[in-house]
């Protein structure tokens, strides 16, 4: 279910402050965050954000096509390695 249009998109306050501070300094550095639920807004374009996937922070470069999506969509938490292989040789 999508968020109501009369509400603003959710962005964590600490993340918004970090982005505004970097925009005023015009410097590029990785912003580390655990807020996967934050929505990508146009002021984030051009920044690299380290999004936590439960184990480590994955650096994601924000482009204009990502606006409106959540940060967590770009940092997968599960790593599917395939189904267990059947070992028929050990059964014989």
Curated annotation (Swiss-Prot):
One of its GO terms (molecular function) is rRNA binding. GO terms for cellular component: chloroplast; mitochondrial small ribosomal subunit. Keywords: Chloroplast, Plastid, Ribonucleoprotein, Ribosomal protein, RNA-binding, rRNA-binding. It is found in: Plastid, Chloroplast. It comes from the Eukaryota. Disulfide bonds: none annotated. Its main location: plastid. Pfam families: Ribosomal_S19. GO terms for biological process: ribosomal small subunit assembly; translation. Belongs to the universal ribosomal protein uS19 family. Protein S19 forms a complex with S13 that binds strongly to the 16S ribosomal RNA. This is Small ribosomal subunit protein uS19c. It comes from Coffea arabica.
